[in-house]
Amino acid sequence: MKVFDISDFQPDDRVGQLVAQGAEGIILKLGETLHGTPTLDSKFIQFVNDVVAAGLPYGIYYVSHARDMAGFMEEAKFINDQVYNLLGGQEPELGTWWDMEIGPVCRDDVWPQLRDAICTMQSWWNNSQKIGIYAQYSYFNQFIDLAELAQYQIPVWVAQYGYFENSLKAEHPELHHVAWQFTTNDETQDENEWYGF
């Protein structure tokens, strides 16, 4: 399944362009914590309306800056509130993803906090199995307890470019692999191979 992910870095007509390229799904940036405040992506509403109008399934991602458990819970509440207020409380078909790549979340004590935030959101969303983690291959290996990740079967969306295979999937088939971001197309547009939930 050909899935792209987009944010306010992309031009206003990007959804139409991706549909023309054969997109089968799109993951939209919901927001990011900026200057300590959870903030809605400036093009989210436009893009989600475009995707719905195109009849494509979509997911959402949130770029975390959480420095501690309180930060994760503030972000979780923001995500929950936006899904309720903007999406009518309907969980996106292609999932809800914690984007783990910014400095504050690159720390040795991040995993228990991220795990507990996801488990809390699962309890809010009727035991949802579509709340997952997006990160680079190196991040999963350095900061995530892979044994627990497999135990909880939290969905995995891994970024790894320039390889002939998804190395995390090959090395850890026990994980719940959902997607592989395999290229940025020269930093113009992220593209993913979607395995599904």
Describe the residue ranges of each PLM region.
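Functionally critical loop-and-helix segments that line ligand-binding/catalytic clefts
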Residues: 1-8, 16-20, 24, 145-197
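Substrate-binding cleft of extracellular glycoside hydrolase catalytic domains
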Residues: 1-123
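Flexible, glycine-rich phosphate/dinucleotide-binding loops
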Residues: 35, 67, 140, 165, ...
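Detector for Asparagine
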Residues: 49, 80, 85, 126-127, ...
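Structural detector of well-ordered beta-strand residues that form the stable sheet scaffold
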Residues: 59-61, 132, 157, 180
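Catalytic domains of cell-wall/extracellular-matrix polysaccharide-remodeling enzymes
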Residues: 92-170
